[in-house]
A protein has these predicted regions:
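N-terminal targeting signals for export/organelle localization
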Residues: 2-47
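A short beta-strand-turn-helix
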Residues: 42-66
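Short pre-active-site segment immediately N-terminal to redox-active cysteine/selenocysteine motifs
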Residues: 65-66, 72-76, 119
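Thiol-based oxidoreductase modules, predominantly thioredoxin-like and allied folds used
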Residues: 72, 91, 96-109
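Conserved small/polar residues in nucleotide/adenosyl-binding loops
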Residues: 77, 142-146
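Typically the conserved alpha-helix immediately C-terminal to a functionally engaged Cys/Sec
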Residues: 81-93
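Structural micro-motif
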Residues: 109, 115-124
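A short, hydrophobic beta-strand/beta-hairpin element that forms part of a small beta-sheet core
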Residues: 121-134
């Protein structure tokens, strides 16, 4: 009887671990397989791909070749977590047309400070030419598309 109970428990545990690991793997494949362009940036990458504020502190000069959205977020932030799937949908819809970048404010404190990020999520909307605009708080897919 103990052997049967132990076997059932072991199989249940194995099934649970396998199911959880399988979900994580398919999520990563989904992000790569659908050409989603959500890129997590460090300060060095931001300076190269978006705006080198150290070299040009007074003049905005976008370094990219197409418009971009920069999401300043934190992993513990509820509204940031709610915004993540919305940005993934935008990345699918506008793949190849818009860069979508994410910056973890806890890992990149200096970068967040340089932009005066006080509330998260904060979205920095960067047009191909002209000055960027800012949106704060979680917003819906419909609002982001407008």
């Amino acid at each position: 009887m103990k052997l049967i109970k132990s076997t059932i428990t072991a199989l249940g545990l194995l099934f649970t671990v396998t199911a959880c690991a399988g979900n994580k793997e398919s999520k990563n494949q989904n992000m790569k397989g659908e050409n989603m362009e959500i890129v997590h940036l460090t300060k060095a990458e931001f300076l190269k791909k978006v705006y080198n504020y150290e070299a040009n502190p007074n003049d905005w000069k976008y370094e990219g070749d197409k418009p971009a959205i920069v999401d300043f977020y934190a992993t513990w932030c509820g509204p940031c977590k709610a915004l993540a799937p919305v940005l993934e949908e935008l990345a699918k819809e506008y793949a190849g047309k818009v860069y979508i970048y994410k910056i973890d404010v806890d890992k990149e404190e200096e970068l967040a400070g340089a932009f005066g990020i006080r509330s998260i999520p904060t979205l920095l909307w960067i047009p191909q030419s002209g000055k960027p605009t800012v949106t704060q708080g979680a917003v819906s897919y419909t609002h982001l598309r407008a």
